Amino acid sequence: MSIKVLVTTGCGNTVMGGADIWTNYFLELVWPTLPVKRDWRLLIDSKRPASFESKYLPKGLVHHFHYDDPEKTRTWLDECEEIHVLHPHYHLRPHIWHFEDKFKTVFVHAYAREMDAAISAIPELKRLQYNTQVDSDFYDEYLATFNRRIWVGNNTTTMIDEHPNYTYNVPNFYEFKNNLPLTTHVDNGKIGFASRIESRKCVHWLNDHKGYILTNQFDLQNLKDSSTYSLKGMEVFQWDVNHHHFFMLKNFGIFHAAYFKEPFGYSIFQAVDYGKLPIINKDWAPEVEYKYRVSTKNEFDECVKQILKDSHEERVTNIKNLKEYMIKFDNKDVWIDKIRTAILG
């Protein structure tokens, strides 16, 4: 038996972000196509969430949470021949790093150096809590040890410049299943936000606005406690992947998706799919002709005012441009084939 270990940070029914969604798609669509799939094991390098249920993982997939039994992790990694990382942490994990000679493929969902650069370049972000532990120097060294690096974003990245050899781009995919027309709720001025609390996602720009937030309430409270942002006009809902559909049907029409250095932007695709008008960052898919782009809090506030002034036809024209760009990523079969090829080398 030639054991191969897949490493990730989260998956199953406890989805916390786009990387977890990507991992779930890999396990559902790619893992069953791998040769001798029973030889592939899943190491979830985190604590087991209280609400995690194994039934949401593919039947027959052997899996293990690192903190359930660290010794089991060591045994797996010691016995295996290959390690493929579906989604890595952004800092040193000694129990993984010890086996660097077995590293084969790493899928990169965000480039740590770009995350740090985005925070450092914008004074207001430097004052906010940085939710994710990041060590850019180590992360670059970590990426360099793999035989292959796969960038899953649709946006360009300097990672490819830093690691030009055996680094490939296989963008994520998104299937449009709702295809709702642009809602007229845009006119009520309410704004939605459905993502993790990270400094680069600028949830604080919703201060002085009204609407709804779907996220981890603990992280949001930390932001409030450590800043002057009260977000008192926003109604907050605890993140649960099962609540997302109903959240996106609420009576708001504008969606805050102006995240800095967003690699793929799964929630931006979701906003368009649900007929919401996203405000996006100037650095996201800049090749697309789209009017509602910002890079500061002031620009965000002015953009909301502009949206409310614009006609419904003007808004529809813009969201149509955005969706035409997004549709080219709506090809699951092509994605499966490319990811399978990438991991098999």
Where are these regions (language model features)?
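A short, glycine/small-residue-rich beta-strand->loop->alpha-helix junction that serves as a flexible
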Residues: 8-25, 50, 199-201
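Short beta-strand->alpha-helix junction loop in the catalytic core
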Residues: 112-114, 155-156, 166-181, 219-220, ...
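Membrane-proximal helix-turn-helix segments that form the acceptor-binding/catalytic region
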Residues: 113-151
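Conserved catalytic-core segment of nucleotide-activated headgroup transferases in glycan assembly
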Residues: 176-179, 184-230, 236-241
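Short alpha-helical segment that forms part of, or immediately flanks, the ligand-binding pocket
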Residues: 245-246, 268-273
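Nucleotide-sugar-dependent
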Residues: 255-268, 282-290
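Short hydrophobic beta-strand element within catalytic cores of glycosyltransferases
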Residues: 276-281
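A charged, aromatic-enriched C-terminal amphipathic alpha-helix characteristic of glycosyltransferases
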Residues: 295-301, 309-344
